[in-house]
Amino acid sequence: MTTAAIIGGGVIGGGWAARFLLNGWDVRVFDPDPEAERKIGEVLANARRSLPGLSDMPLPPEGKLSFHADLGEAVTGAAWIQESVPERLDLKLKVYRSIQEACDPGAILGSSTSGFKPSELQEGALRPGQIVVTHPFNPVYLLPLIELVTTPENSPEMIERAKEIMRGLGQFPLHVRKEIDAHIADRFLEAVWREALWLVKDGIATTEEIDEAIRMGFGIRWAQMGLFETYRVAGGEAGMKHFMAQFGPCLSWPWTKLMDVPEFTDELVDLIAGQSDAQSGHHTIRELERIRDNNLVGMMRALKAQNWGAGAVLNKHDAALKPKALPDLDTADLTQPILTLSRAVPLDWTDYNGHMTESKYLEAFANSTDRFMEIIGCDADYIAAGGSYFTAETHIRHLDEAHAGARIRVETQMLLGQGKKLHLFHRMYEGDKLLATGESFLLHVSLETRKPCAPSPEIEAAMARIAEAQAGLSYPEGAGSAIRKPA
């Protein structure tokens, strides 16, 4: 088990702790705040509810979390040390000195700083090349972007190792090759923030109206396509040059007060805080965090279905987890029902009753059928060559409830696999509890004629192998059932 040390257990430090812990790392936390354990516990509760459901594969077993009163004890032997202390350069440099006196020279020391350059953090350090900026975005346990900012002091080998570790956590390391104050993303956030302050101060818009302008329009566009690609599309068939020619004159118009900052007075603070309370004060912070996480999970899973943006990052992480998560024809115990799905129930799989909605049982069983098809050789290459299976009939029994975050698995028994016919019986479990069964009858088809036909000899052989191995299994209870006519 690999160990990470988290120095500073606030919102960001807690998010880092959750990201490492839920990806199988042991985590040691150092934070003198007597409330640190409670605060991190609340962040972890949110993370356990939301992060596992982003993946279509099971995450590794959760690591061990421990809290330490001694900084040296926390960092000794850690492979990754993440500093998330307050944004004071003198404090950070003091903390680095203490860390480097105790830590492994080969450990990566990442800073969550949103503003300082890595060269500033490396100044006077015992080992400057050990320190990099790894700037995350809240919630750290969900959002994949990490701005990895380096200097010539950092070796190429160390930089690649840092990237590899972050990718293993399901993150997207964006290597910022030239350091600058506030890196990349926070410079955009600061520009938008300054413009928003002016709009409120001048009475043009309220905090709620500004938020609506973002979340009802360009915020959604940016989330899926960014800034430049969005404008490229806006240019139509003529592309980016047309867009630039069309809107270039705007640069000389009074459309922004970007470099002109309103005076930061108590009156401005009270004005914005009051409007914000009126806008969102009916929700607690914890409620808002859960609303945020629900929305982020839904949006990122939608991007995942398109293999786009943050969704493509999630799919790559799933692909890395898959070989260890599900067996194939040669590694499965074919004498028993075969594991064809193992995952957590995502937030967007639940309904108004607070449990997994019926359409998602069908989706889960369909995914299990797809996995069984892969096991017998009907994979993407086979389908591209013109053969596949079509489902002719499905029957689902709902036997118990599943809730968001529940770790479920599906085990599949082949009742018939002969010629063009494939008859499967799926059982869905949470632990030892049987939640549902799904029965499917499929026909092998030619994608050219769209009519049933015999599968390849390789698929026939794989089905025969499974049929022989599972011959001793009893016929499942519930198989062949239908909804009975009411008495």
From Swiss-Prot:
Region (Betainyl-CoA thioesterase): 328-487
E.C. code: 1.1.1.108, 3.1.2.33
Binding of NAD(+), residues: 8-13
HAMAP family from the UniProt entry: L_carnitine_dehydrog
Keyword Chloroplast among UniProt keywords: no
GO-annotated biological processes: carnitine metabolic process; catabolic process; fatty acid metabolic process
Single GO term (MF): carnitine 3-dehydrogenase activity
Pathway: Amine and polyamine metabolism; carnitine metabolism
UniProt family annotation: In the N-terminal section; belongs to the 3-hydroxyacyl-CoA dehydrogenase family. L-carnitine dehydrogenase subfamily. In the C-terminal section; belongs to the betainyl-CoA thioesterase family.
Single GO cellular component term: cytoplasm
Functional summary from the UniProt entry: Multifunctional enzyme that catalyzes the NAD(+)-dependent oxidation of L-carnitine to 3-dehydrocarnitine and the cleavage of betainyl-CoA (N,N,N-trimethylglycyl-CoA) into glycine betaine and coenzyme A.
Protein name per Swiss-Prot or TrEMBL: L-carnitine dehydrogenase/betainyl-CoA thioesterase
Cell compartments where the protein resides: Cytoplasm
Region (L-carnitine dehydrogenase): 1-327
Catalytic activity: carnitine + NAD(+) = 3-dehydrocarnitine + NADH + H(+); N,N,N-trimethylglycyl-CoA + H2O = glycine betaine + CoA + H(+)
Keywords: Cytoplasm, Hydrolase, Multifunctional enzyme, NAD, Oxidoreductase
Species whose genome carries this gene: Ruegeria pomeroyi (strain ATCC 700808 / DSM 15171 / DSS-3)
Main location: cytoplasm
Quaternary structure and interacting proteins, as annotated: Homodimer.
